[in-house]
């Protein structure tokens, strides 16, 4: 059976989008997703995203298979791409259209704005060790500036969940981090029973952060939306940042706000269609 798809990217974090609205079961297996994501022998992507029927009163359901076949709870850049994909499927003009999307991390609400950006209500950050989850500290306590030994070096880390686990550490120069070496060590560290995404953050000013990321199940990527959100939260918790800041990723900038009004995280950034095809 031929599979129609459209490729999108959010700041270079790229995804294969599949219209799965006719069924609650993904059209392909995780093993097939691995083949499709291969950048040499497949289409090439960081993951495959399915637009499925909504659940519990939502408009749609989002599921993702990473490039290694694993299934994350949510993806920030991915949900912006999904919102753009749905708008294109429905023939909408991207003018203040809002979707309620069911994900494994809860209900996420992206809004398509007149300037072509997509603003996403990412919900409340989860800060307790048991929610992340991590074995660092007590399960009912926060993990802020905790020591973590990785590869013989002690790192100060702050842990945040945006529905998926993030371990954030602040460094002098993100460009100097050997991400391909140290990233997998963080991801598979025994302190993270469900593995973890890891963000290395350089604070340029209180409203400007530079970030590099090792994504759980995908490795080095050009951008990570949930990671940018978690990193701002970590920067605020450690007194390094204001609650509204630009997070500069290798693929470009995201605007992240941790609202003082409702304590929710709002992410604003682009999502662009690359091409369509059939496999």
UniProtKB/Swiss-Prot annotation:
Substrate binds at residues 13, 66, 76-77, 164, 197, 215-216, 225-226. InterPro entries: DAP_epimerase_AS, DAP_epimerase_DapF. It catalyses: (2S,6S)-2,6-diaminopimelate = meso-2,6-diaminopimelate. GO terms for biological process: lysine biosynthetic process via diaminopimelate. The active site is at residues 75, 224. Pfam families: DAP_epimerase. Pathway: Amino-acid biosynthesis; L-lysine biosynthesis via DAP pathway; DL-2,6-diaminopimelate from LL-2,6-diaminopimelate: step 1/1. GO terms for cellular component: cytosol. Its EC number is 5.1.1.7. SUPFAM superfamilies: Diaminopimelate epimerase-like (SSF54506). Keywords: Amino-acid biosynthesis, Cytoplasm, Isomerase, Lysine biosynthesis. The record marks 166, 215 as: Could be important to modulate the pK values of the two catalytic cysteine residues. GO terms for molecular function: diaminopimelate epimerase activity. It is found in: Cytoplasm. HAMAP family: DAP_epimerase. Belongs to the diaminopimelate epimerase family. Homodimer. Catalyzes the stereoinversion of LL-2,6-diaminopimelate (L,L-DAP) to meso-diaminopimelate (meso-DAP), a precursor of L-lysine and an essential component of the bacterial peptidoglycan. This is Diaminopimelate epimerase 1. It comes from Nostoc sp. (strain PCC 7120 / SAG 25.82 / UTEX 2576).
